[in-house]
From Swiss-Prot:
Cofactors, names only: Mg(2+)
Family: Belongs to the protein kinase superfamily. Ser/Thr protein kinase family. CDPK subfamily.
Gene: CDPK1
Source organism: Plasmodium berghei (strain Anka)
Knockout-associated phenotype: In the mosquito midgut, male gametocyte exflagellation is normal; however, the rupture of the host erythrocyte cell membrane is delayed. Fertilization is normal, however zygote development into ookinetes is arrested at the retort stage where ookinetes are still immotile. In arrested ookinetes, protein levels, but not mRNA levels, of a subset of proteins including MyoA and MTIP, two components of the motor complex, CTRP and SOAP are strongly reduced.
Name of this chain's protein: Calcium-dependent protein kinase 1
Membrane topology: Lipid-anchor
Domain of life: Eukaryota
Taxonomic lineage from the root: Eukaryota, Sar, Alveolata, Apicomplexa, Aconoidasida
Keywords in alphabetical order: ATP-binding, Calcium, Cell membrane, Cell projection, Cilium, Cytoplasm, Flagellum, Host cell membrane, Host membrane, Kinase, Lipoprotein, Magnesium, Membrane, Metal-binding, Myristate, Nucleotide-binding, Palmitate, Phosphoprotein, Repeat, Serine/threonine-protein kinase, Transferase
Enzyme class, broadest EC rank: transferase
Positions that bind Ca(2+) 2: D428, D430, N432, Y434, E439
Pfam families reported for this sequence: EF-hand_7 (PF13499), Pkinase (PF00069)
The enzyme's E.C. designation: 2.7.11.1
Amino acid sequence: MGCNQSKSANDVRGNKVNHVNSKKKNNKREDTNDGEEIAINPGMYVRKKEGKIGESYFKVRKLGSGAYGEVLLCKEKNGHSEKAIKVIKKSQFDKGRYSDDNKNIEKFHEEIYNEISLLKSLDHPNIIKLFDVFEDKKYFYLVTEFYEGGELFEQIINRHKFDECDAANIMKQILSGICYLHKHNIVHRDIKPENILLENKNSLLNIKIVDFGLSSFFSKDYKLRDRLGTAYYIAPEVLKKKYNEKCDVWSCGVIMYILLCGYPPFGGQNDQDIIKKVEKGKYYFDFNDWKNISDEAKELIKLMLTYDYNKRCTAEEALNSRWIKKYANNINKSDQKTLCGALSNMRKFEGSQKLAQAAILFIGSKLTTLEERKELTDIFKKLDKNGDGQLDKKELIEGYNVLRNFKNELGELKNVEEEVDNILKEVDFDKNGYIEYSEFISVCMDKQILFSEERLRRAFNLFDTDKSGKITKEELANLFGLTSISEKTWNDVLGEADQNKDNMIDFDEFVSMMHKICDHKTF
């Protein structure tokens, strides 16, 4: 289940430190609050919940089961949206991965905490979203988004093989997720069609990478040595127990091969036969099965299935290959309205208020539905030219230029670069120099949808932990997980919305603050 070399389990039980300095990639800004800055990120909302899980969710049906437990489809009692809950037995662990001496179960539990810590840190449109964590004497409960489309594996069984456009759109999303993971020093180690889910059965354009139980943090100077993975997709260097993050690229190459011809490059009657072929690394493009497949596709497969991982392409290089660029979707004229609205909403957003930032990010990342996010998610992925799951200054400028090419909607905007700098200053909540997926969704979505009374009430209740009807600075410090921030800074944050100067924020003041940060009108 584990994430070796990961953050400590204490990060899961508490909250992630969000106190950063003002130095960042690509952008420099002045410190506020006497040099103190508070970074906002979606992971701060994922905490181990108190109480029984049955008080928050009720079971609809079982979705599946495995060695560690089962996955249930559940509904929220407050909000009624569907979630998938991974139920992990505390008494279960892979005895083959541990010695039989002491503290086996403790080690297993530590790895689960590490998996949770990893999932908290991820914010990408093609990676599973974690919402809540519960724990009792017998089980861990991981509450995630529910994807009704099933596994990519099922699509492969039903369709046998895919045309190059469909295959390219699938691979672009998988590689984008892997590229994002690798840039954050995370290796998945079990990429396979069973761990790729579809949001719905009618579209291949929104897939999710799931099951980070074998994932690990890595460093460039340290070779991974655990032999983990699934026979068809395991890289030869993993069998030798000396490898790096490029083992994920090999797995992607195997998936791409299967998508285009319907069978794996390394087959066999059993795992032992398959592994023998993987160890040799020899595969072929059968003429009859591959005669109508482009040379660009074969070239990319060869790059990803290069036996020597030192010579193998990276996920980013694969993502920017000729085949992906030729066959995968890009921004077109039909995207004009959504793109225009997204850029307009970012321009109008005033993100100086930290409490408002935290509230809008919570609503956008945790309370919106897949359907509500669909169009903006598609635009985000198309703007993300290098596929790393983040928008940088160059990509935002290109977005403006693309829109101008369609129609002179932004003719009054004279200095695009200056405008993009302002957008990054306002929308980059976590101060990393990029606009992350959840930041983009939260700021770009129509506020008439985002700011329903129910969602504003749920956001307010997130801060009002003692249910007193007022938000205090102590509650803010607890949510942000910061103990080193000065009292003056918290007073400033509270004062952003405290209209009656009672050193607390009631619901009416909270709503007023939220409506001030951006105009309701879309572009």
